[in-house]
Amino acid sequence: MKISLSPATPEAWSGSVLALGIPENDPQGLVAAMEQRFSLQLSDWLKQKPFSGKPGDCVSLPLLRSDCTALVLVGLGEASSVDRDRLRLAAAAAARAAQGQGGTLGLLLPWSSDTPEEDAAAAAEAVRLALYSDERFRSKPEPSPKPDQLELLGSLPGGLSHGLEAVHPVCAGVELARELVAAPPNSVTPAELARTASHLAHEHGLELTILERSDCEERGMGSFLSVCQGSDMDPKFIHLTYRPNDAASKRLVLVGKGLTFDSGGYNLKVGAAQIDMMKFDMGGSAAVFGAMRAIAELRPAGVEVHMLVASCENMINGSAVHPGDIVTASNGTTIEINNTDAEGRLTLADALVYACKLKPDAIVDLATLTGACVIALGDEIAGLWSGDDSLSSQLEMAAQAAGEGLWRMPLHSPYRKGLKSLLADMKNTGPRPGGSITAALFLKEFVDAGIPWAHIDIAGTVWSDKGRGLDPSGATGYGVRTLVNWITNQANT
């Protein structure tokens, strides 16, 4: 989709679909202006529709004998309450209303005079991401026509076009994450993730190292390797690196959970455990892949970024890990596996040890780790655990700017006793109460003291059955925009 600015007013703009954000009571008189332009009794028509300018209101009116094919009105709520999140939702609603139409979408929203560039970029991202559809696995794809050009109307500075250049790389990263999460487990395997990394490295000049099973054995990654004992698929430990053109003053590491399918192992997922949806247990790896895709094109200065994904399947056969087995992680920590369905933290443990050896300035891991986080925060907010206030604030600000829900949770150290094992250094799960906290405390054991680290549990946010906001139903690509914001912010400090 081509994105540009247009100096035209809504009274003069011509294109396929004209979409206007309308606050309650229409203080700017846009409805009256459209009545005059299109010779419509628009006010009378709106009285018959559920449209009063409230958030969520959206109506589309086909236009005959006009240089536009449709007029879309999107409610914004009280004018004084319009913020960037509301602009995103309005832009996404306008995009969906324009679906089925080709050509150009003209969009007018009340851009902030203080942050017009950020508002415009957020709206442009919302339009592109809301129009996303996945037809890869249909025998007869039925793609709906959609606008191929977006023109942003209103009082936007002419130099703002440069700021919109980041929209396409960021959206491409989100779309990559969505594709990886949505694809079935017979399509996205550990080997396929490795091929995806190879493609990114080749296309964008990134460095790539892939550790095979024997390489992981040499490094003592017994925690990671225990998870894949029952799978015929070979594990892949993927290390992708972005290096800036200039000297790097910061080194950041992104770690993503990469379980391409999780049966639960001998603690088999049954009942409401959604075994049929466990293709999305690699949502953390999808997020960091998407972030690297965007960063590779944006090329922020002064920051070096490493992506680590310990990818495998958790399956059952005669060689699969047993409940009660004791394994040794690459830092020498022994772990009693009291639940084979708490496997993600076992893969992340060795990835975090590897990350620390890179001597980073910060580590952030993302994982679909616990159902407890979903119970606590629902499906629109991810949980954040960190003992570093500065890193937590950076990530919260990055998520807020991205419009992605993120809430800091307590890393309550007294709960560490719940991981105590009679035989090993620790168990891989604690009591059911506070399960997402003990999961984070488990991961903390594999991060060197003094290295800022944050864990983001995206179990609820990685998928949306019905769609919400910018996200169609299915994979959301959550986390990509937050990570990109965080990295680019670090590049600027």
Swiss-Prot record:
This is Probable cytosol aminopeptidase. It catalyses: Release of an N-terminal amino acid, Xaa-|-Yaa-, in which Xaa is preferably Leu, but may be other amino acids including Pro although not Arg or Lys, and Yaa may be Pro. Amino acid amides and methyl esters are also readily hydrolyzed, but rates on arylamides are exceedingly low; Release of an N-terminal amino acid, preferentially leucine, but not glutamic or aspartic acids. GO terms for biological process: proteolysis. Mn(2+) 2 binds at residues 257, 262, 281, 343. HAMAP family: Cytosol_peptidase_M17. The lineage of its organism: Bacteria, Bacillati, Cyanobacteriota, Cyanophyceae, Synechococcales. Mn(2+) 1 binds at residues 262, 341, 343. GO terms for cellular component: cytoplasm. Its EC number is 3.4.11.1, 3.4.11.10. Keywords: Aminopeptidase, Cytoplasm, Hydrolase, Manganese, Metal-binding, Protease. It comes from Synechococcus sp. (strain WH7803). InterPro entries: Leucine_aapep/pepB, Macro_dom-like, Peptidase_M17_C, Peptidase_M17_leu_NH2_pept, Peptidase_M17_N. One of its GO terms (molecular function) is metalloaminopeptidase activity.
